[in-house]
Amino acid sequence: MAVRPGLWPVLLGIVLAAWLRGSGAQQSATVANPVPGANPDLLPHFLVEPEDVYIVKNKPVLLVCKAVPATQIFFKCNGEWVRQVDHVIERSTDSSSGLPTMEVRINVSRQQVEKVFGLEEYWCQCVAWSSSGTTKSQKAYIRIAYLRKNFEQEPLAKEVSLEQGIVLPCRPPEGIPPAEVEWLRNEDLVDPSLDPNVYITREHSLVVRQARLADTANYTCVAKNIVARRRSTSAAVIVYVNGGWSTWTEWSVCSASCGRGWQKRSRSCTNPAPLNGGAFCEGQNVQKTACATLCPVDGSWSSWSKWSACGLDCTHWRSRECSDPAPRNGGEECRGADLDTRNCTSDLCLHTASCPEDVALYIGLVAVAVCLFLLLLALGLIYCRKKEGLDSDVADSSILTSGFQPVSIKPSKADNPHLLTIQPDLSTTTTTYQGSLCSRQDGPSPKFQLSNGHLLSPLGSGRHTLHHSSPTSEAEDFVSRLSTQNYFRSLPRGTSNMAYGTFNFLGGRLMIPNTGISLLIPPDAIPRGKIYEIYLTLHKPEDVRLPLAGCQTLLSPVVSCGPPGVLLTRPVILAMDHCGEPSPDSWSLRLKKQSCEGSWEDVLHLGEESPSHLYYCQLEAGACYVFTEQLGRFALVGEALSVAATKRLRLLLFAPVACTSLEYNIRVYCLHDTHDALKEVVQLEKQLGGQLIQEPRVLHFKDSYHNLRLSIHDVPSSLWKSKLLVSYQEIPFYHIWNGTQQYLHCTFTLERINASTSDLACKVWVWQVEGDGQSFNINFNITKDTRFAELLALESEGGVPALVGPSAFKIPFLIRQKIIASLDPPCSRGADWRTLAQKLHLDSHLSFFASKPSPTAMILNLWEARHFPNGNLGQLAAAVAGLGQPDAGLFTVSEAEC
């Protein structure tokens, strides 16, 4: 086709412009479409360019561009222009140059990025315009961040010898951006900059150049990026030490003191001693060699020589020598004298007579001995007379100085019907008070002085006699009347997990020995005129269906007190152990009670108590004290609020007392750290013929869903062989955390190589995965070692399971009534029950105490429950005396006031 001549200049200009444009694009990637003749300095340049970003989960990302001078800025993503409505634009003027400035922002969502398929990545770029041309920014790539759950390669457990190299491989999960890797040793970060013996390779493997004993630990590979943090399975690394011989000792002395014998020398496998399952030393530890010792020759006397001529002193002599044979090679010297003399004139020689001075000396010694005897006899008579004077009655003695023994109250007049006689404890020295019993409801309130050293003044003008009591007819009649009441319910008898007794308004105490479980019945808790037979029972977990939901766990024994439905006018106090580590941030604790229909109900949420509640609980480190006016079946249940919630487990190691076979079993029990659980295991082991072989330990078990592992190590292979087929045993987490399974244990079976082997030395490890652990070093003779037997001697808890009346309380009745009457009324100076609660560290329960008719009685009842039978009355007396009541006349009691 022919072109008109006038069009050639136009076509030539278009081609020239295209060539210039291509040349400019090659020279600069950021400049495009310059205006012919424009100043290049006025082309847009970017102050802020978009950068590579990652989308985490579903959160959109923000891209920002800022250029000067710029009249327009638009984003282009994957070659397509972003809609104008999606741009957020800010215009301004540069303060230094006066040129127009523009800033543009857009959001990129996960859905936009996911629309791009194939190998192409999602990118965005800014294009800025000015009057001189356009400029393109750098490309920003937008990627979706993620981190897979499973590691491509996890570290494995290893056992290495000392100074051997360790390589723990780890390939982290696939992720964008690629995961960073760090290592944990027993939950502590491994920092190669602080430990030159450790480094991490580019492939993320952990390398220990030379293994040390301190490198025995659980190692965990941790991968993390901006999305998540992943942990591998922990790999247990055990650095063992093979045994090495020490140097030989010096040869011993020859076994025969005379003639042919033996010498020996020894060495021990302690350089180093085998550790963590390392091999025992090879070879003999004793060497023997023959020896010969010269026999000692004892000396013997030769024959006596002839007598010498008679001397001027009328004696002559003879001699002998120790030469037949002479002593040699350590033999004994001759015994006897080597020179013998005698009178040579017989009766013609004069004999020396005793001097008169010797006779006088003997007479003087006899006289001194007689005087000493008479003096000792006189001193003895004086001592006996003084002792008789000390046996007289003691008047006006303070009850505090008499030890607060149980009080036997006898009527002073036959026509007084309100006086009772309580049978005393015949095994102790008691104090008899002759007078009437002051009740808090009768007559004016007694008061006593607290500002001086003792707790109370002498009791009126009554007479106090210290003596050993014997049963009286009045006491026998009272007990018989209590036992013949016909309106109480009959109860089962003869079980070791039960206590029962008959009580009236004087109160008392029930205890199940060796369990930490007791029931305190304060005075006036039972209405006057009523007599109840009350029981206290410990239930086995398998006999009670206690529903536990979610993360709940049983922290205490299940205890019943009854009979249910009896009328009580004051709260009784039920005491029982628990195995929780109290922490308001880790536990939600609830007191559960079984209803008459058999269902369990939450009757108290600890920490949310109110004075109107029928129940109240004082929680301490190892025990809880429940105030209740309704008897029934109770249990303390905890619900974990975090993985820091901890239960105390007691670990006990038992083995047979007698071992007649080659096999020897070590039983490791993991039970609640409560007295009742210990009692059950001890009774079981007595039936099995077991003995304790190591001191018990306490392990803190966390709510981390990790199991409890048990393993045995360092068993001498030359003496014993372990029949365990795996490196460790496990008790599942839920078996322990549920708290309702008894006798949880693992058994390690060892086999003796020789039937004569009796010494056992090994280690038993018990630990929670990624948690607390304990190690037992066993060094035990299985035939005669009984050094741990005394640890099983359970402490007695006050003798009889039931105590009735004043003998059940540390504080005597009259002193108790005085304290109540003095501290119940409010005092402007603070000398009342509130200050007493603060001194006894019970001020967190002031609202509960204040809701009761007698707050002081509640405080004293709790003190009795916490401190019986070993409470320090001196400390209580000091706390009461420190309140500073000023009037000395307020605190005197006489028989007339009663």
UniProtKB/Swiss-Prot annotation:
Principal localisation: membrane
InterPro entries recorded: DEATH-like_dom_sf, Death_dom, Death_UNC5A, Ig-like_dom, Ig-like_dom_sf, Ig-like_fold, Ig_I-set, Ig_sub
GO cellular-component term (any): neuronal cell body membrane
Domain named Ig-like: residues: 44-141
SUPFAM superfamilies per record: DEATH domain, Immunoglobulin, TSP-1 type 1 repeat
Domain TSP type-1: 242-296, 298-350
Subunit-level organization: Homodimer and homooligomer. Interacts with the cytoplasmic part of DCC. Interacts with MAGED1. Interacts with PRKCABP, possibly mediating some interaction with PKC. Interacts (via extracellular domain) with FLRT2 (via extracellular domain). Interacts (via extracellular domain) with FLRT3 (via extracellular domain).
Annotated protein name in UniProt: Netrin receptor UNC5A
Originating organism: Rattus norvegicus (Rat)
